[in-house]
Swiss-Prot record:
<keyword id="KW-0804">Transcription</keyword>
<dbReference type="GO" id="GO:0016887">
    <property type="term" value="F:ATP hydrolysis activity"/>
</dbReference>
<dbReference type="InterPro" id="IPR003018">
    <property type="entry name" value="GAF"/>
</dbReference>
<dbReference type="InterPro" id="IPR009057">
    <property type="entry name" value="Homeodomain-like_sf"/>
</dbReference>
<keyword id="KW-0805">Transcription regulation</keyword>
<dbReference type="InterPro" id="IPR023944">
    <property type="entry name" value="NorR"/>
</dbReference>
<dbReference type="InterPro" id="IPR027417">
    <property type="entry name" value="P-loop_NTPase"/>
</dbReference>
<dbReference type="InterPro" id="IPR025944">
    <property type="entry name" value="Sigma_54_int_dom_CS"/>
</dbReference>
<comment type="pathway">
    <text>Nitrogen metabolism; nitric oxide reduction.</text>
</comment>
<feature type="DNA-binding region" description="H-T-H motif">
    <location>
        <begin position="479"/>
        <end position="498"/>
    </location>
</feature>
<dbReference type="GO" id="GO:0003700">
    <property type="term" value="F:DNA-binding transcription factor activity"/>
</dbReference>
<dbReference type="GO" id="GO:0000160">
    <property type="term" value="P:phosphorelay signal transduction system"/>
</dbReference>
<feature type="domain" description="Sigma-54 factor interaction">
    <location>
        <begin position="187"/>
        <end position="416"/>
    </location>
</feature>
<dbReference type="GO" id="GO:0003677">
    <property type="term" value="F:DNA binding"/>
</dbReference>
<feature type="binding site">
    <location>
        <begin position="278"/>
        <end position="287"/>
    </location>
    <ligand>
        <name>ATP</name>
    </ligand>
</feature>
<feature type="modified residue" description="4-aspartylphosphate">
    <location>
        <position position="57"/>
    </location>
</feature>
<feature type="binding site">
    <location>
        <begin position="215"/>
        <end position="222"/>
    </location>
    <ligand>
        <name>ATP</name>
    </ligand>
</feature>
Length: 504
């Protein structure tokens, strides 16, 4: 089998039609899966010795949340080391990273696997993986044909990475690799709320504004602070963390501003505080709402004038620190109640960010579950940790009052329970491995009994209309691709569509 010019042109056209990088990547993967007739396809970005899924088709949704470290996935490591097409034989002893992750085939292992490393110049930027359940599924395609596919994918990915760098104004030093991927954070999610949050982080990171990060306990406020710091010009300097809720009043001032020798009993030497440690960098004050009013006043002075005084010292020290603060309280209500200074609130909330709770993030719960499953797999030395359909359904319908932190603990606990009832190094998490209270799953929809109101000819034509509409929708109204999917000649498809009233 060989690719026609039309096939390659169709792939290129789909890349151009996409609105935004994510849409283009998904169109590419979906089109490739149809053209190559594979069971699963994935586009991965390479970053810091791990592959990060950007778009998938035919794989469980939680794959998008997984981070595939090369050390734990020998096939992906082989692809990363190769400079060309990699074909894994059906009897390869190297485990496939997608075993158990093809919906409906969880108990079966992938038999055919092809990996295409993607390069920008000499730099590895990603990979394209093709998987099938039949041992010889990709034998009909030559290496040269697969190289053409890889070239198209590499071009799309390298352009996206370059645009991403330019848009973020986070250009790398001149001696760095021009297509080096941006730093990966653990802020996993594609929901509208998380997409908006990531955009806001990108905007505020380039500035030097103080940021107030609000959100319920367990939503990931510390990860937001880390993402802001790492995308900011201060990233080369330290990010210093301080949990205000864990500060006893007696040592809080010393922790923040430091002290000199002899300032109080036990002060046997000079000691720098968190502000000094964060000089030219960023200070993250977690649970800022727990600070006493006295300390709030001293913190306000630092934000206003940029100088600090160590406990027991009359001299002032200049510091250049960006402050990121986080709270799970409503600080406006705290101000009204007299428990938080209004002037400090306004100083901190120059650019407020709200981290959405997990219950408002839709399918993000499945992506995050995949991330934690992969973490458990690596930590416990397991060959695979996958979610059953029942487990995914349960996770999507639980409210998670403890948010992402509760999900993480639930996955770890479920893995331990599963291993206790099943031998071997393969773990399939079932719904019964999760102990969530008061989870009401929607009842399965009863199959409707059709009422026949048409004669055979009318019913046949209605079925044909529906089938053609679905094919066109799946192929973005590309008639040639739709004809291939329906295994008919494109001219015949046009004639049939005209007869059925689907086109003029």
């Amino acid at each position: 089998m060989s690719f026609s010019v039309d096939v390659l042109a169709n792939i290129a056209i789909e890349l151009q039609r996409g609105i935004g990088h994510q849409d283009r990547f998904q169109r590419l993967i979906t089109t490739l899966r149809q053209v190559l007739e594979c069971d699963a396809s994935a586009l991965l970005r390479y970053d810091s010795r791990q592959f990060i899924p950007l778009a998938i088709d035919g794989l469980a949704k939680d794959v998008l949340g997984r981070r595939f470290a090369l050390e734990g996935h020998p096939r992906l490591e082989a692809i990363a080391r190769a400079g060309d097409v990699v074909r894994f034989p059906a009897d390869s002893e190297l485990p496939d990273p997608y075993d158990g992750l093809i919906p409906g085939q969880e108990s079966l292992k992938v038999h055919a696997c092809v990996g295409l490393p993607l390069f920008a110049g000499q730099n590895l930027i990603g990979a394209l993986t093709l998987d099938g359940m039949q041992p010889d599924q990709f034998d009909v395609f030559s290496d040269e044909e697969l190289r053409l596919i890889a070239a198209l994918a590499a071009g799309a990915l390298s352009n996206a990475l370059l645009i991403e760098q330019l848009e973020s104004q986070n250009m790398l030093p001149g001696d760095a690799a021009p297509f080096e991927a941006l730093k990966e954070t653990q802020m996993i999610g594609l929901s509208p709320g998380m997409t908006q949050l990531k955009k806001e982080i990108e905007i505020v990171a380039a500035s030097d504004l103080n940021v107030l990060i609000s959100g319920e306990t367990g939503t990931g406020k510390e990860l937001v602070a880390k993402a802001i710091h790492e995308a900011s010009p201060r990233a080369v300097n330290p990010l210093v963390y301080l949990n205000c809720a864990a500060l006893p009043e007696s040592v809080a001032e010393s922790e923040l501003f430091g002290h000199v020798k002899g300032a109080f009993t036990g002060a046997i030497s000079n000691r720098s505080g968190k502000f000094e440690m964060a000089d030219n960098g960023t200070l993250f004050l977690d649970e800022i709402g727990e600070l006493s009013l006295t300390l709030q006043a001293k913190l306000l002075r630092v934000l206003q004038y940029g100088d600090i005084q160590r406990v027991g010292d009359d001299r002032s020290l200049r510091v250049d620190v960006r402050v990121l603060a986080a709270t799970n309280r409503d600080l406006r209500e705290e101000v009204l109640a007299g428990r938080f200074r209004a002037d400090l609130f306004h100083r901190l909330s120059v650019f407020p960010l709200l981290v959405p709770p997990l219950r408002e993030r839709g399918d993000d719960v499945i992506l995050l579950a995949g991330y934690f499953c992969e973490q458990c797999r690596l930590r416990l030395g397991l060959s695979r940790v996958v979610l059953s359909a029942g487990a995914r359904n349960l996770l999507q319908h639980y409210s998670f009052p403890g948010n992402v932190r509760e999900l993480e603990h639930a996955i770890h606990r479920a893995v331990v329970l599963s291993r206790a009832t099943r031998s071997g190094d393969e773990v399939i998490l079932e719904a019964q491995h999760f102990a969530f209270p008061e989870v009401t799953l929607p009842p399965p929809e009863a199959a409707a009994v059709p009422i026949v109101k048409q004669n055979l000819r009318e019913a046949t034509e209605e079925f044909q209309r529906k089938t053609i509409r679905q094919a066109l929708a799946q192929n973005h109204h590309n008639w040639a691709a739709s004809a291939r999917m329906l295994e008919t000649d494109v001219a015949n498809l046009h004639r049939l569509a005209k007869r059925l009233g689907l086109k003029d």
